[in-house]
């Protein structure tokens, strides 16, 4: 059996877990993931469209980020992210993004997002929303000629975010996947596999303009047979040296993360890794442009 067919077989064995967990497991941006994913109260770059759209209200100009990931040293398995934001109006920003996890011509999970954020009521307080389109496909399964196989599945969800940003600290609340989408690639399945809704509460503090400390709690909606209401956490820190080089570290629900960044004028390069005893380590690389 070829490597690709073996991957298809493995994915089909864990398909419910893949559909539920894959869309939740991907975390966007090497900067954010180097900080343990504690980014809900930070949300100050183009990946805010995924983390907390309320952050769009505080940005300026165009921001573009692209990310590639090598997953667990498996050559055919990867994550890709692209996001673009624009804030050219007073107190308002918009953005769009795409995230993919999969194996070429075998299995794909795609997420498309459209976001907007605006400062409201008082200076420093913003609200934002993100419309999500989830698409699931396993073209490699056509090899098995299963009459019950669907070519793909699609559903929709909505995120709502709030952010209060003071001079040295910020606090945030985000609700993800409102509407709790369900998808299935097997036509005989009565109920699709859910992508759980989740509440995230976070805070961040900036020390002497060079050190950022952030943390958050994540509370998924309980779905019998799929998700328990188990609270997860993320902690992270970022330190900048002469405004050009950054070191990052974090903890994501007990798993250690680390990262670094290099900024040259309008270009920033970020790298991160997530250490998992099994199945291995995730390596992420991001390029970001501010213009």
Which ranges hold each PLM region?
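Cleavable N-terminal export/targeting peptides
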Residues: 1-29
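Subset of outer-membrane beta-barrel
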Residues: 20-291
């Amino acid at each position: 059996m070829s490597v690709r067919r073996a991957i298809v077989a493995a994915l089909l064995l864990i398909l419910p877990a893949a559909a539920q967990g894959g869309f939740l497991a991907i975390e966007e941006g090497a900067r954010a993931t180097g900080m343990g994913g504690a980014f809900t109260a930070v949300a100050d770059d183009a990946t805010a469209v995924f983390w907390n759209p309320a952050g769009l209200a505080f940005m300026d100009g165009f921001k573009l980020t692209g990310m590639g990931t090598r997953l667990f040293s498996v050559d055919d398995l990867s994550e890709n992210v692209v996001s673009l934001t624009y804030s050219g109006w007073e107190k308002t920003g918009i953005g769009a993004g795409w995230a993919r996890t999969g194996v070429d011509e075998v299995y794909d999970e795609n997420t498309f997002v459209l976001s907007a954020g605006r400062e409201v009521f008082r200076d420093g307080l913003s609200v934002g929303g993100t419309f999500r389109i989830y698409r699931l496909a396993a073209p490699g399964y056509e090899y098995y000629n299963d009459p019950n196989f669907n070519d793909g599945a699609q559903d929709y969800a909505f995120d709502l975010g709030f952010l209060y940003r003071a001079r040295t600290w910020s606090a945030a609340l985000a609700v993800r996947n409102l509407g709790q989408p369900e998808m299935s690639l097997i036509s005989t399945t009565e109920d699709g596999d859910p992508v759980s809704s989740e509440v995230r509460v976070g805070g961040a503090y900036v020390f002497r303009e060079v050190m950022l400390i952030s943390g958050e709690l994540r509370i998924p909606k309980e779905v019998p047979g799929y998700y328990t209401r188990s609270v997860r956490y993320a902690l992270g820190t970022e330190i900048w040296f002469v405004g050009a080089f950054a070191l990052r570290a974090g903890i994501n629900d007990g798993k250690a993360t680390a990262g670094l960044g290099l900024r040259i004028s309008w270009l920033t390069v970020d790298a991160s890794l997530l250490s998992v005893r099994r199945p291995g380590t995730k390596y992420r690389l991001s390029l970001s442009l501010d213009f």
